[in-house]
């Protein structure tokens, strides 16, 4: 009985916005979290149906001590679970079984009324269906090997995806989409780290940096755990050394595991707060690129279960929490811009809020006038949705920003700003151009000397 009370309490906590389904289900070690999670999701999936059956049977009128959410989970398992009610004999079981005939009758009537044969047809449908994105880990594999290993048929759009189909993304290199029903976690490609499950939008920061021209030295990932973006950087820049910062001990372990699975041997994990590093340290003198994805509200994250919560889970962000997040985001971005040889920085969040996105970038750039937003042509031009000009200090800044709307284009809600230091970029260009010119002159001179030597030897 404790199990059903626990599930009912989670339903109550969800209505009070005390957490997500997953958080609440997996917080308790007393009950099987997977079983709890499944029952809560299934109950929510059929909530309108269960409520109608309970109302028409007058269950709560006749059993005044029975609470609404407990009635929902019990009636769900009585009518819809293959194993039925998993409950020992007692008052609650007797209470439900007393009304079994009436509940079953109302269930049958409802199916007839709706014109369906099975209860599955009565379930709530998810209006936002995201594909599962797989990043091909080029450290360990190739596109050809992965596609052959999946054994799926190619389609030309994510809308055409099905259990036996895949789609090659046209915006991010080495990224493919598959249907969520495909059992990828059981596939050897996933187990061996040859493919990494990573949302398309989450691939944008590293993809933006990879699309830039010019010299690339060392790279910093300032908020690295769980490691998807870090390992993406490692794959995009195999000749660069990557410093991956994470201050939380548990998340460091997650990061180490992810880096290990990916096979990235050009990553150094730094268990420390990135904002406490000394930008002028010799250790970071070769850093030219920085990727920042700091803590945020997560308001853009689309869970596959969000639709089950309906309007009950519409999030009105706590103003104080948002302000604290924005303060931290501004601090870490300002810190990143202090590295003396850094030329490119991407700042990203999985938030849809102006405060955490355009406002943070504009505020920091107003204090760091040597830094600018990059151009559209250097910021994944294939992705059409940019920053919001009205939110920017100068409308043109929006071109160097990327926005993703939750669910649109198969992504979560996301934001990326592509920042650069024009003077340092130009100086680096000149320096490496001069080096190239010097090398060319030396090669030319050497060729002349070789020819001259050969001619002299021929004359002798």
Curated annotation (Swiss-Prot):
Pfam families: Methyltr_RsmB-F, NSUN5_fdxn-like, NSUN5_N
Residue stretches of biased makeup (Basic and acidic residues): 430-439
Enzyme class: transferase
Cellular localisation: Nucleus, Nucleolus
Source taxon at top rank: Eukaryota
PROSITE patterns recorded: SAM_MT_RSMB_NOP
Chief site of localization: nucleus
Keywords recorded for this protein, A-Z: Methyltransferase, Nucleus, RNA-binding, S-adenosyl-L-methionine, Transferase
InterPro entries to which the protein is assigned, alphabetical: MeTrfase_RsmB-F_NOP2_cat, MeTrfase_RsmB-F_NOP2_dom, NSUN5_7_fdxn-like, NSUN5_RCM1_N, RCMT, SAM-dependent_MTases_sf
CDD domains: AdoMet_MTases
Active site: 350
GO cellular component term, pick one: nucleolus
Keyword Hydrolase: no
GO biological process, one term: rRNA base methylation
Biased composition (Basic residues): 440-460
UniProt catalytic activity: a cytidine in 25S rRNA + S-adenosyl-L-methionine = a 5-methylcytidine in 25S rRNA + S-adenosyl-L-homocysteine + H(+)
Region ranges (Disordered): 430-460
Keyword Protein biosynthesis (UniProt): no
Gene3D superfamilies xrefs: Sun protein, domain 3, Vaccinia Virus protein VP39
GO molecular function: RNA binding; rRNA (cytosine-C5-)-methyltransferase activity
Residues engaged in binding S-adenosyl-L-methionine: 223-229, 246, 273, 293
EC number: 2.1.1.-
Job description of the protein: S-adenosyl-L-methionine-dependent methyltransferase that specifically methylates the C(5) position of a cytosine in 25S rRNA.
Subunit structure: Interacts with trm112.
Family that this chain belongs to: Belongs to the class I-like SAM-binding methyltransferase superfamily. RsmB/NOP family.
Protein name: 25S rRNA (cytosine-C(5))-methyltransferase rcm1
Species annotation: Schizosaccharomyces pombe (strain 972 / ATCC 24843)
Organism placement in taxonomy: Eukaryota, Fungi, Dikarya, Ascomycota, Taphrinomycotina
